Amino acid sequence: MSQSGYVIDQMISAKAIAARVEALGAEITEAFKDTDRLVVVGLLRGSFVFIADLIREIGVPCEVDFLEASSYGNETTSTREVRVLKDLRGIIGGRDVLVVEDIIDTGHTISKVMEMLRARAPRRIECCAMLDKPSRREVDVKARWTGFEIPDEFVVGYGLDYAQNHRNLPFIGTVRFTDPQK
C-alpha cells in the first residue's frame, strides 16, 4: 500500500489477528471466570478496534470504560511524557480491571496508567496488549496477555495510526518511509 512519502507493508494479517483475539478472549475468560465485576478499560485511541473485537470474545459479563493517555502526539516515537487526556467515567475501586492497550513500546504510557489505576484500589488489575515491542522497553512493565511480539518497526492498522491515518486497515502493517525527509 503506497502513500505519499511512505509504503505500508503487511506484517500481521487480519486472519491472524482474528485468531489471536479469539485465543486471548478464551484465556481472559478463564482468568476472570469467577468475577461478576469485570471492567475492561480501553486506552484510546489506538485500542478501540482491538477492544471491540476482544470484548466479544470474553465470556464473562463486563463493563467497558475508556481512558485516553498519550506519549506520542503526531510523532512516530514516544515523547516519554505521558499525558492523561480523558479519564474514566466509572469507579473501579473494588472491581476486577482489565486494561487493554494497543501497543507497549517504551512502557512509559502503560506504566503510568497502571500506577494511576492501582491508586484507585481495584480488587485486581491486569493488562492485555495487542502488540509488544520488548526491544524498545525503557520501563520494566509487561502485559499478562500479548497478541503479538513485534520488532522495532513503526506499525499502523487495526486501530494504530500514523498522524491519525490508517487506523481502519484490517491488518497491521509496517511503515517504510520512501521520502528521505521523513
Curated annotation (Swiss-Prot):
Native species: Rhodobacter capsulatus (strain ATCC BAA-309 / NBRC 16581 / SB1003)
SUPFAM superfamilies: PRTase-like
Root EC class: transferase
Key words, A-Z: Cytoplasm, Glycosyltransferase, Magnesium, Metal-binding, Nucleotide-binding, Purine salvage, Transferase
Function: Purine salvage pathway enzyme that catalyzes the transfer of the ribosyl-5-phosphate group from 5-phospho-alpha-D-ribose 1-diphosphate (PRPP) to the N9 position of the 6-oxopurines hypoxanthine and guanine to form the corresponding ribonucleotides IMP (inosine 5'-monophosphate) and GMP (guanosine 5'-monophosphate), with the release of PPi.
GO cellular component, one term: cytosol
Pathway the protein contributes to: Purine metabolism; IMP biosynthesis via salvage pathway; IMP from hypoxanthine: step 1/1; Purine metabolism; GMP biosynthesis via salvage pathway; GMP from guanine: step 1/1
Protein name, UniProt field: Hypoxanthine-guanine phosphoribosyltransferase
One of the record's GO molecular function terms: nucleotide binding
Primary localization: cytoplasm
Binding site for GMP: K133, F154, V155, D161
Recorded catalytic activity of this chain's protein: IMP + diphosphate = hypoxanthine + 5-phospho-alpha-D-ribose 1-diphosphate; GMP + diphosphate = guanine + 5-phospho-alpha-D-ribose 1-diphosphate
Chain residues that bind Mg(2+): E101, D102
Entry EC no(s): 2.4.2.8
